[in-house]
């Protein structure tokens, strides 16, 4: 009798698992599509964030370069207006500019 009870329990468990497999097998396409959409949306969000970071970095670099150019141009204008023939224009304020030429 115990063998019949254990066999019945095993059959019940096997039938429940097979029913679950049948239910799950019907939704594999939907699951695959949802997983694919999740992956694609994650990639799109990552790409957008990378593009935004690159744009911010490029913008900051451009602003710094423009600031340096404007400061140097203003200094050149002041140096030209305040020019003394025996002194180079930029060496008074920026002596490090002559280092590459040494």
From Swiss-Prot:
Membrane topology reported for the UniProt record: Multi-pass membrane protein
Tagged with keyword Membrane: yes
Keywords, comma-separated and alphabetical: Membrane, Transmembrane, Transmembrane helix
Subcellular location: Membrane
Transmembrane segment boundaries: 33-55, 57-79
A GO cellular component annotation in the UniProt record: membrane
Further remark: Partially overlaps YMR317W.
Name of the molecule in the record: Putative uncharacterized membrane protein YMR316C-B
């Amino acid at each position: 009798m115990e063998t019949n009870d254990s066999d019945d329990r095993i059959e019940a468990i096997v039938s429940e698992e097979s029913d679950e497999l049948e239910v799950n097998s019907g939704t594999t396409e939907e699951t695959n599509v949802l997983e694919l959409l999740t992956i694609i949306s994650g990639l799109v969000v990552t790409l957008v964030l990378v593009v935004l970071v690159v744009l911010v970095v490029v913008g900051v670099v451009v602003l710094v370069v423009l600031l340096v150019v404007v400061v140097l141009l203003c200094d050149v204008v002041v140096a030209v207006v305040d020019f003394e023939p025996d002194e180079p224009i930029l060496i008074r304020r920026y002596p490090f500019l002559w280092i590459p030429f040494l």
